[in-house]
Every structure is written in C-alpha cells, then in structure tokens.
Amino acid sequence: MRLVDAHNHLGYWSPDGTQSVGELLLEAEKRGLHGVGISDHYDPDCEMSDGSPWTFDPKAYMEAFYSKRRMPSKRQEGDPPGFLVGIELGWMPEVSDVLHNVIRDYPFDFSIVSIHYFRNYDPFTHAEHIYTSKLHKVYTEVIHTIADSAQDMKEANIVAHFDFFSRYAPERDSKMHYEHAPEAFDRLFRIMMENKQALEINVGTVNSLMKRKDYALKDAMPDEKILDRYIELGGDLFTICSDAHHVEQNGLHMNETLQYLESLGITEFVWFEERELFRP
C-alpha cells in the first residue's frame, strides 16, 4: 500500500510536540511508508501559558524544511519515504483572515483545517464549559462548526479529526456516532465534496479513547455509519494519520485501523503535493 501519513507534529514547532524531524523520518522508513508529512499547529485562537499564540514562524519553517521535501509521487523503489511540508490550521471565525493569509503567502504542500477550541474553550483544560448538555447536542454543534470551517477554508485540503471532541467528554461512553448529529454530518460531507477536501481518519482518537476511556481497540474505531454515510453521499477522499506528537505515537494502532477500514471497503488513501491531489 502506498500510504502517506501526513498529519504529524515536531518539537519546538508545535508546543505539544517532542519528536525531531529525523526521528519522524526514521519511523516512516521503519514503517515502510510511501511518504510522511509535517503539519505543525497554527492556532492563532489558542494561547500558551505565557499568553503567546499557539503558532510558529512560517518563514522560518520554510527555511528549515522546504529544501528537504521529497515528492511521494516521484518516489522509486529503494528510495526513502517522501517528505511533505504542511500546516494544521486551527480555525475559529475571528482568525479566518489570518489563516487564509498564511496559506496564501507560503508554499505549503497541503493544509489541514481543524477545530481545537469550542466556545472559546480548550476541551482538554475546560471541559466543563463545553460539555454542558447531552452529547448529541454538543456533537451536533461541533460538527456544524467543523462544517463552517471547511466551508470558510475552501482551499484547505484535509478536514481533521471530526471526532476530536469525543476524546475529552466526561461521559465514559463518548465515542462519536452518526446518530449523534446526522444532519450536521451530511452538511459537512456535502461541503467537503464540493471543495474536494479529504476526510481524515485520525488514529490519535482511537488511541485516546483506549487510554482515557478504557475502550477496547475494536470499539474505539471510527463509527462505521459515519464512514458509510460519507461514501453513500459520494465521498471517496480519505486520509489516515498518526497525528503523532511523540516518537512512540508514530503508527500506533495504524495497522489495526487499516484492517478495520479495509473491512468497510476503504482501501485507498490520498495525499497532496504542492496542493495537488494524488491517489495511490
């Protein structure tokens, strides 16, 4: 399988990352990947403990990594894995212009749009301000917000971890299901298909549900009905990622997730080079 694991983070560039680019590339080679990408956090709406925004200097990022790029589409047998330079855009309406500008001004191979804050709160630190009603109500609002982000950031290539907020809900059984937000999911998927944006399967959520909520591996997998509905509506652009922030997270439970997806008929995962869509 020609697999490109594009959503990963590095120490220094992402405040919550610790791995180096060398470690990431070594892990990619060990795993036999076709390619790997970096996509560090660019969340102008989030603040670190000192009050500074959760962003990096894109000019310095390009100076550090752009010349190291290797296009997976040009990879030959025996070559090391491809290496792509992307960005994860933390969306909120008030920072929309900032996000549009950064991907206009810098030649990222791909951009990932994501929601990390909701109602101006971080679910990791202020869950009590987010999960204030039944899960179906919270998840409906969340998915509509993700749909808003996909609609606004039409130029973004990938919509990240739709199930991110299931990681931090106080309920023991917090896995996100299609039945939680059917109309919102349908709206999101239609927007994504219109924009030719890929749906990300984020193995980080699988790992989080197992670690935080004691889910069995098979039960932590993405909801089958969500994926079936995306396909039913005409969606066929999938990516799968480790969302690794630390060395030990690279490929963690990736093979099991791939096997699960294969059982649903999902066997092809796309990637983006110079913002152009590639299929295996």
What spans do the regions from the language model cover?
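A metal-dependent hydrolase metal-coordination microenvironment
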Residues: R2-H144, H246-Q249
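Divalent metal-binding pocket/active-site signature
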Residues: T18, P44-D45, S52, Y106, ...
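Hydrophobic residues within beta-strands of alpha/beta enzymes
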Residues: V36-I38, S111, V159, L199, ...
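Histidine/acidic residue-rich metal-binding segments in metalloenzymes
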Residues: D57-S67, M71-R75, G82, I103-D105, ...
